[in-house]
Amino acid sequence: MSELLATYLLTEPGADTEKKAEQIATGLTVGSWTDLPLVKQEQMQKHKGRVIKVEEREGTAASEKQAVITIAYPEINFSQDIPALLTTVFGKLSLDGKIKLIDLHFSEAFKRALPGPKFGVYGIRKLLGEFERPLLMSIFKGVIGRDLSDIKEQLRQQALGGVDLIKDDEIFFETGLAPFETRIAEGKQILKETYEQTGHKTLYAVNLTGRTADLKDKARRAAELGADALLFNVFAYGLDVMQGLAEDPEIPVPIMAHPAVSGAFTSSPFYGFSHALLLGKLNRYCGADFSLFPSPYGSVALPRADALAIHEECVREDAFNQTFAVPSAGIHPGMVPLLMRDFGIDHIINAGGGVHGHPNGAQGGGRAFRAIIDAVLEAQPIDEKAEQCKDLKLALDKWGKAEAV
């Protein structure tokens, strides 16, 4: 019988942790057990949850008690979709005190019902023809209220700086100044021109927004227009919505999952989901080719262990393509050695102000990032590289080098 394993962190679980775990296993499956007659227990046994592990530990405060428990849920109890799964293992339980869902282990049968990334790390690299270094992405900044001519010029300047990907701001919606379809068409023309000028290919991720009922048609139209990638605020819509986009054969476009709203689900040490589960495993399983999340050293920083755990879930060996991890927020060129130390080659360096705020503009910012990436790959001293690349020197003079965390 196939089972799904859910692992929880309980804070102040009560005097009897084993009893609490058994109550959860029973309460979220058959509802009651000891009150059932023996014949009914035999009939219901295949539906009953099982306690797999109970491990007590000290909490963050000296007087605080915590426990990690793992419960097996028979998959016969729910349909093979994420809404049914989450309602089963963390529906009413999420309202029952200090309980955090930290991991899910899926059966191979359930995995077959999920799409995973269409492209993944290798597929994105293949689109760009770049396999030997971290990719570099920049972000449109300050575009609210700007018309299409401003958007086009920002796109051009970023591409000329040598970035591999450019994404819309997640708060850039349909307001009439720069319509979705027009941005795609005009963006493709700009990037065609910069490729002809530099020989460097750049992809543009356009923000897919609007009412849920309209998203598939809008995404299909984007695909028809040749969109390179779709930025998607997955946690404003739901994982199942992203899954629907990812598994649609008429939307053969990479999906870039933005973490907006996810902090409401992950930030508490006592409630919600672990960062690794929500931004790593579930994003990957539901079809994200890219997963953005705060880096350990930027302006909106995650603890290093949490950021590394997200990355691990994105790339660990599994039934699905790997998801590109995109540590973000407040990234500048001086952070690149830390990013490459912690996340290796297969991640994307994502910068906004670190590109646009460069003294030589977005082109200079892109060149500074590319120079320091090359220096790290070649084991060249950063200061030596800065003497060879004026843009890098200006960036380091402005932002400095990030300290190890």
From Swiss-Prot:
<keyword id="KW-0479">Metal-binding</keyword>
<dbReference type="GO" id="GO:0016984">
    <property type="term" value="F:ribulose-bisphosphate carboxylase activity"/>
</dbReference>
<comment type="similarity">
    <text>Belongs to the RuBisCO large chain family. Type IV subfamily.</text>
</comment>
<dbReference type="GO" id="GO:0019509">
    <property type="term" value="P:L-methionine salvage from methylthioadenosine"/>
</dbReference>
<feature type="binding site">
    <location>
        <position position="330"/>
    </location>
    <ligand>
        <name>substrate</name>
    </ligand>
</feature>
<keyword id="KW-0413">Isomerase</keyword>
<dbReference type="InterPro" id="IPR017443">
    <property type="entry name" value="RuBisCO_lsu_fd_N"/>
</dbReference>
<feature type="binding site">
    <location>
        <position position="258"/>
    </location>
    <ligand>
        <name>substrate</name>
    </ligand>
</feature>
<comment type="pathway">
    <text>Amino-acid biosynthesis; L-methionine biosynthesis via salvage pathway; L-methionine from S-methyl-5-thio-alpha-D-ribose 1-phosphate: step 3/6.</text>
</comment>
<feature type="binding site">
    <location>
        <begin position="167"/>
        <end position="170"/>
    </location>
    <ligand>
        <name>substrate</name>
    </ligand>
</feature>
<comment type="subunit">
    <text>Homodimer.</text>
</comment>
<dbReference type="GO" id="GO:0000287">
    <property type="term" value="F:magnesium ion binding"/>
</dbReference>
<feature type="binding site" description="via carbamate group">
    <location>
        <position position="167"/>
    </location>
    <ligand>
        <name>Mg(2+)</name>
    </ligand>
</feature>
<feature type="modified residue" description="N6-carboxylysine">
    <location>
        <position position="167"/>
    </location>
</feature>
<protein>
    <recommendedName>
        <fullName>2,3-diketo-5-methylthiopentyl-1-phosphate enolase</fullName>
        <ecNumber>5.3.2.5</ecNumber>
    </recommendedName>
</protein>
<feature type="binding site">
    <location>
        <begin position="352"/>
        <end position="353"/>
    </location>
    <ligand>
        <name>substrate</name>
    </ligand>
</feature>
<dbReference type="InterPro" id="IPR036376">
    <property type="entry name" value="RuBisCO_lsu_C_sf"/>
</dbReference>
<keyword id="KW-0028">Amino-acid biosynthesis</keyword>
<dbReference type="InterPro" id="IPR017717">
    <property type="entry name" value="Diketo-Methiopentyl-P_enolase"/>
</dbReference>
<comment type="function">
    <text>Catalyzes the enolization of 2,3-diketo-5-methylthiopentyl-1-phosphate (DK-MTP-1-P) into 2-hydroxy-3-keto-5-methylthiopentenyl-1-phosphate (HK-MTPenyl-1-P).</text>
</comment>
<feature type="binding site">
    <location>
        <position position="169"/>
    </location>
    <ligand>
        <name>Mg(2+)</name>
    </ligand>
</feature>
<feature type="active site" description="Proton acceptor">
    <location>
        <position position="92"/>
    </location>
</feature>
<dbReference type="InterPro" id="IPR000685">
    <property type="entry name" value="RuBisCO_lsu_C"/>
</dbReference>
<dbReference type="InterPro" id="IPR033966">
    <property type="entry name" value="RuBisCO"/>
</dbReference>
<keyword id="KW-0486">Methionine biosynthesis</keyword>
<dbReference type="Pfam" id="PF00016">
    <property type="entry name" value="RuBisCO_large"/>
</dbReference>
<dbReference type="Pfam" id="PF02788">
    <property type="entry name" value="RuBisCO_large_N"/>
</dbReference>
<dbReference type="GO" id="GO:0043715">
    <property type="term" value="F:2,3-diketo-5-methylthiopentyl-1-phosphate enolase activity"/>
</dbReference>
<keyword id="KW-0460">Magnesium</keyword>
<dbReference type="InterPro" id="IPR036422">
    <property type="entry name" value="RuBisCO_lsu_N_sf"/>
</dbReference>
<feature type="binding site">
    <location>
        <position position="141"/>
    </location>
    <ligand>
        <name>substrate</name>
    </ligand>
</feature>
<feature type="binding site">
    <location>
        <position position="170"/>
    </location>
    <ligand>
        <name>Mg(2+)</name>
    </ligand>
</feature>
